[in-house]
Amino acid sequence: MCSIVEDDFGDEGGAHAMKEDTPQPELGGNELCRKCNTEQAVLKLNQKEPQCRVCFLNYVRHKFRASLGSTKIVRRGSRVLIILTGEPANVTLLDMVRFGLEQDAFKQLRIVPVLLYVDDDFVGNTSEARLQQLAERLQVFKQFESFPAYYTVCGSSRHVALTFDGAFSPAGFEQDEARLLQVLDAVRSVSSKQDLLEQVRKQTYRQIGHALQCAYVFLSDIGVDLAKTLLSNVALGRGCSLAQDVAFCDDRYNTVKLVRPIRDLNPDEVSNYLQYSEQPLLSYSPAKHFEDKPSLQNLTAKFIDNLMQSFPSTVSTVYRTGDKLDAPKAARNECCRFCGAALDYRGSKTLFATEYSRLVSSRINAACSHEDILLKSKQMELDAERAVNGEDDQGEERVLMKQLCHGCRNIFEDLNK
């Protein structure tokens, strides 16, 4: 066994070799801002110089504007659908958009914002709890009532105008809600439930965006969210769409593109922005669906949150790994029917090994002789290869599986037939 640098690894693997980020010195009592050298500093971010309130707000807003300007993806005058959640990062994004629209002609943000709230609180909640959460969210959304806003439920292709006068009621979507709840109830594992809900949510963004004639959808994902997404998608078998799921722009559908303009922000910058903004900003942080149950996504989120406490600079390294990946290009008929990712199953050795193992478990038993095993193994290899490539003719199920990527296949196979 190799013993090179064996002292670096003990019973804890290489964990003890990683050094925690050095705590930054706290802000002095009368320390001046290192940017303008005139105003008193009010905060000091990790690995940054002390800043006053104005310089800090300019710094965060510049990161937002620079991400839009450097990519040149969002065209001037475009209608942009901004997804409402009410969470701190979402409120930060909305306030920066509002601030950009209020600037003079030279610095003005030239987009036409349209807000959309996609309601999925009917999942796992009583009607009373759902209405209570909606009322709390509306108080947060009311801060941006100058923008046109719409309401829909997850999985629906319909939308209605959203009002903030307290009389709004989510009626008329009962069939859409019942259909999604029926599908979720049929899924066995929590990991597949969460993955299914996320994919349906993205489909809803694109459908409503297309209906409202918005070519772009702004999401309020920040760096730590994308780090969780990246590692979760690896575990879920969504490697083919990994680059697009954490990229600045997800353009797998050319008609409506998902844009993440504040992906470079971290939780400290978001919380300080809400604290030091020109006017008080409310936010809402509800519990996520299935958050208290074991799943691949929840385990990954817990790992990233713990990493953020001791090694915050490592989190950005995790999600920026996605920038080094390229999404495979495929024709429209070579994309997953459910999530739109390029189909990745043909010739996959990993899927072949999984399918072959399944066939061995179902066809080989203790009563089989050595000759029978050798004879069956050749046939199982052929059957496994045909199953992976979707070349076996076994009814409508296989026809559908042939049109799904590996990640979506896992959801389908997790359904109670």
From Swiss-Prot:
Q: Any idea what job this protein has?
A: Plays a central role in 2-thiolation of mcm(5)S(2)U at tRNA wobble positions of tRNA(Lys), tRNA(Glu) and tRNA(Gln). May act by forming a heterodimer with NCS6/CTU1 that ligates sulfur from thiocarboxylated URM1 onto the uridine of tRNAs at wobble position.
Compositionally skewed regions (Basic and acidic residues) per UniProt: 13-22
Kindly provide the name given to this protein in its UniProt entry: Cytoplasmic tRNA 2-thiolation protein 2
| Taxonomic source organism | Anopheles gambiae (African malaria mosquito)
Q: What molecular function terms (GO) are annotated for this protein?
A: nucleotidyltransferase activity; sulfurtransferase activity; tRNA binding
**Pfam families documented for this protein:** CTU2
> Where is it mainly found?
cytoplasm
Where does the record place the region Disordered?
Answer: 1-24
Give the classification, highest ranks: Eukaryota, Metazoa, Ecdysozoa, Arthropoda, Hexapoda
- Compartments, record wording: Cytoplasm
Write out the entry's keywords from A to Z. Cytoplasm, tRNA processing
Question: Which Gene3D superfamilies does the entry mention?
Answer: HUPs (3.40.50.620)
Q: Could you name the domain of life of the organism this protein comes from?
A: Eukaryota
Pathway the protein acts in: tRNA modification; 5-methoxycarbonylmethyl-2-thiouridine-tRNA biosynthesis
The coiled-coil segments of this chain are none
